[in-house]
Amino acid sequence: ISSRVEGCAIKWPNDIVIDGRKVCGILTEMSTQIDYINHVTIGVGINVNLTEFPEEIRETATSLRLECGHVVKRAPLIAAVMKRFEQNYTVFLEHGDLSGLKERYSELLVNKDREVRILGAKEQYNAYALGINQTGELIVRKEDGTFPFSGGTGRSTDCLLYTSDA
């Protein structure tokens, strides 16, 4: 999407936004053992040709059709998404982590160099988002140092919010 739409960015960890409005969400589920991945399930939802949204998300959501100004054909879009996924997955397998992708990810990271509000299961704090590390954790800087934040438990209480428009 970022190669075709100006203003496209990643909102860590799993949203694609265009000028701050969500156009795509990605959900993952993984089953692992100590040193083995049993399976990974990935779900991608893209707002393709919607022209209206429910009132509660109208200000925060968009679609490719609204951003591009024309109807977007789904088949070529899905083919392009799958091709890019395959390319990125190949890089991931070569490195065994996200180190081969983190520079591009950080370039597209809308959270980078912004003050964010971390709402964790055990603590809440403001920090500055610096980028991601090789495991995909968001690197944040607080007064007492620099730390990775994973949002790790998958609970809805673990999240990150913007606090300023840097």
Cite the ranges covered by each PLM segment:
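Cytochrome P450 core scaffold surrounding the K-helix E-X-X-R motif
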Residues: L50-I57
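Contiguous, small/hydrophobic- and glycine-enriched helical/loop subdomains that border
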Residues: I1-N38, T60-T62, L66-A79, K83-E94
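A short macromolecule-binding patch
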Residues: T146-R155
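Conserved small/polar residues in nucleotide/adenosyl-binding loops
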Residues: Y162-A166
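Mixed-charge, Lys/Arg-rich low-complexity intrinsically disordered regions
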Residues: T90-R104
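SH3/SH3-like beta-barrel fold
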Residues: L138-K142
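Short coil-to-beta transition motif at edge beta-strands of beta-rich domains
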Residues: L108-I118
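Short beta-strand-centered aromatic/proline hotspots
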Residues: Y125-G131
